[in-house]
Amino acid sequence: MDNKLSSENNQLSSEKILGLLPHRYPFALVDKVIENIPGERAVAVKNVTINEPQFQGHFPERPLMPGVLIVESMAQVGGIIVTQMPDLPKGLFVFAGINNVKFRKPVLPGDQLIITCDLLSIKRQRFGKVKGEAHVDGNLVCAGELMFSLVD
């Protein structure tokens, strides 16, 4: 493993993540970044717990993490990549689209999502695209491309 990747300096705590992203409870969906290459790649952890509000209605007898929240978790990891790029304007980057997102397996309370995002492109310093994947226990549960746009 590359020394720059193994350094604890390349990890981000939940407090540091709160400094990079505007999301707050109950929509802060990234607990820790375990690999961070600003402007290129991030690998993060989302611990899924039964105490999250979505499980009150999705579904009480068989709780499943909604797919849209898995995608949102991936988007937030992508946002961590983009917000650390010094040459981009500061502002609010929001979801602009998704391509080829596929859900492979259900995500349950007690699971730990490992989310990997790689920056694919930045255009006109306003639009970005990342490739995202989410795994549980080494199994792919969701993958796709996510697009972002800077809001004025």
Curated annotation (Swiss-Prot):
Domain of life, source organism: Bacteria
Broad class of where this protein is predominantly found: cytoplasm
Subcellular location: Cytoplasm
The enzyme's E.C. designation: 4.2.1.59
One of the GO biological process terms: lipid A biosynthetic process
Active site, per annotation: 58
MF annotations from Gene Ontology: (3R)-hydroxyacyl-[acyl-carrier-protein] dehydratase activity
Family of the protein in this entry: Belongs to the thioester dehydratase family. FabZ subfamily.
Function: Involved in unsaturated fatty acids biosynthesis. Catalyzes the dehydration of short chain beta-hydroxyacyl-ACPs and long chain saturated and unsaturated beta-hydroxyacyl-ACPs.
Name of protein: 3-hydroxyacyl-[acyl-carrier-protein] dehydratase FabZ
Organism: Prochlorococcus marinus (strain MIT 9312)
